[in-house]
């Protein structure tokens, strides 16, 4: 059997389960240790029996046991970098890439060329903090998480990608004593406890990283009510949140930072996905 035939057979099976066709490609690339272009270059080559066996076993786990592809192959692409992931950490989402992109854009706009201290709260796999450190060498990142298992994954990613991020274990603001930051960024758990969640997500990803209390706002209240002592005189707070939380985020931001400028940004699907809070002396163009 050739790679082309194996992939066609697998794609038909994936379609019959009403699942993502790209999953078959990702699984085969991983099992055969091939990069994206290499799979198509080898389309007419015969596949080794052991590769076929391993690939079909993983495909069955994806289709029949509903396991995420990213956990099966042990990695997820984020902002062009491969991050190791496992069930201890949330699988990085496209929306979070937009959060990183907006942080970098606003760094250039308000702090360009300056060396800054950045805090990544509830880091999970480390994808936010590590990417910021890799994309902008002037950003010195500290990342925290409650889960030691998650931090083990994040430290592994940090070492592989040589990002130079510092990691602290503790509950939200707990490990920050004596530290101050220019930028605080976080994608905390924000799904309300009673909200219906896709089985693929609910049955596989860590609930600690998914659910944000009864209304999904628990961790935003913790962050915004307690972060002030850890901010420098001029600081930017950058938060990803549920698309329906715009008014609540503005109200919360203004409660704890009444003189700050608050900016709510939309994601690529035109949903209100990020809130940026500017504390201190920021210059704005008319």
Task: Label each region the model flagged.
Residues 56-136, 141, 146-156, 276:
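SAM-dependent Rossmann-like transferase core, predominantly class I methyltransferases
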Residues 34, 42, 67-68, 73, ...:
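Residue-level signal for pocket-adjacent positions within structured domains
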Residues 139-140, 144-285:
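S-adenosylmethionine
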């Amino acid at each position: 059997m050739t790679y082309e035939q194996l992939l066609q057979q697998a794609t038909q099976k994936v379609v019959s389960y009403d699942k993502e066709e790209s999953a078959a490609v990702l699984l085969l690339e991983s099992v055969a240790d091939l990069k994206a272009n290499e799979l198509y270059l080898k389309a007419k080559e015969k596949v080794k029996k052991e590769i076929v066996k391993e690939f079909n076993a993983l495909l069955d786990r994806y289709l029949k046991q509903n396991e995420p592809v990213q956990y099966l192959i042990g990695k997820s692409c984020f902002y062009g970098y491969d991050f190791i992931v496992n069930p201890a950490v949330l699988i990085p989402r496209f929306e979070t890439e937009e959060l990183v992109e907006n942080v970098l854009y606003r760094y250039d706009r308000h702090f360009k060329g300056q060396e800054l201290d950045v805090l990544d709260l509830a880091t999970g796999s480390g994808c936010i903090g590590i990417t910021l450190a890799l994309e902008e060498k002037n950003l010195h990142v500290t990342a925290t998480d409650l889960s030691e298992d998650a931090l083990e994954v994040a430290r592994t990613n940090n070492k592989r990608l040589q990002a130079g991020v510092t990691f602290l274990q503790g509950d939200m603001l707990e490990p920050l004593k004596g530290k101050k930051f220019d930028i605080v960024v976080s994608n905390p758990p924000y799904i309300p406890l009673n909200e219906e969640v896709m089985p693929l997500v609910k049955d596989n990803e860590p609930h600690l990283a998914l659910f944000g209390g009864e209304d999904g706002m628990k961790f935003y209240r913790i962050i915004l009510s307690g972060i002030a002592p850890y901010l420098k005189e001029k600081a930017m707070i950058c938060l990803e949140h549920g698309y329906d939380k715009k008014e609540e985020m503005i109200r919360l931001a203004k409660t704890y930072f009444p003189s700050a400028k608050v900016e709510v940004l939309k994601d690529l699907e035109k949903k209100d996905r990020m809130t940026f809070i500017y504390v201190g002396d920021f210059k704005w163009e008319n």
